[in-house]
Amino acid sequence: MTSILREQRRDNVWDRFCEWVTSTDNRIYVGWFGVLMIPTLLTATICFIVAFIAAPPVDIDGIREPVAGSLMYGNNIISGAVVPSSNAIGLHFYPIWEAASLDEWLYNGGPYQLVVFHFLLGISCYMGRQWELSYRLGMRPWICVAYSAPLSAAFAVFLIYPIGQGSFSDGMPLGISGTFNFMFVFQAEHNILMHPFHMLGVAGVFGGSLFSAMHGSLVTSSLVRETTETESQNYGYKFGQEEETYNIVAAHGYFGRLIFQYASFNNSRSLHFFLGAWPVVGIWFTSMGISTMAFNLNGFNFNQSVLDSQGKVINTWADVLNRANLGMEVMHERNAHNFPLDLAAGEATPVALTAPSIHG
């Protein structure tokens, strides 16, 4: 009998850690990007939850009029938010150690910067982790490319827009009603509804929803029957099976006759590329629109642009939209200034389209 003695493998702790981090056998892949993603997202999540529940009011406008955003100060899930950092801080980096006290840091909205910076770093690492796992599994890198669309949108509203406007107080509040307030103010100050990049973004999001619903319903309607009438159709599919689970020829024929022949894809790969690319490109355009409007390259302005033969203004929808913008702008930061800039300078703008005659 021959005995073979193998030398015991002597990996140090660092080598075993590297192997664990990059192993695709783990239930959840960590990756080197995950080493940074996990602590940053945990920090952002914990700080957001604590601030949403218990943060004191924040002097967002920098005029010593704090705005309460937490649940303990009278808000509910809808109205609550982590209020952006003070206009007095501007674009300054404001970590805890830059404040004279913790109370001052809370009063000036320090938690907002802490959450946003850790969140942006964390989701960037998440995209890198997607690429890393795809690389290790020998897959193409398009998953992280698709994820870059919502990532760019987050960077646009939380970082690029405040930089362009000169203060993190102009960033999007971290709450439901705060998000809608941000949208209203953005429309009032930048006329985003009249910006072509926003229009492309709307087409991307709603078009993507439509295409997703159409694709899902077509596939579900053309499944290859593998079960009886009394069983769920889902039991007719076995994970990893080689056979097609639906009849793409039937789906192509149906949709081609419903619209016209060339509106229907006859190639499953090109179809799924289109389903992925359409919303991604649309959201990319929206992010670019936010980033350009951050520096006040605003949407189209057709106000008072249609005149009759005598030179009088024929009011269009653009003029109605302009009055709505002025109304929203007046309500925004009502105590920070007496009038919005475009109301305080220039000729007076009539509030009503026509003034009724009153006969007493």
From Swiss-Prot:
Please list the residues that bind chlorophyll a PD1. 198
Question: Where does the record place the site Cleavage?
Answer: 344-345
Supply the residue numbers of the propeptide(s) excised during maturation: 345-360
Q: Where is this site: Stabilizes free radical intermediate?
A: 190
What CDD domains does its record include? Photosystem-II_D1
Q: What is the lineage of its organism?
A: Bacteria, Bacillati, Cyanobacteriota, Cyanophyceae, Synechococcales
What is one Gene Ontology biological process annotated in the Swiss-Prot or TrEMBL record? photosynthetic electron transport in photosystem II
UniProt name for this protein: Photosystem II protein D1 1
Q: According to the lineage, what is the superkingdom?
A: Bacteria
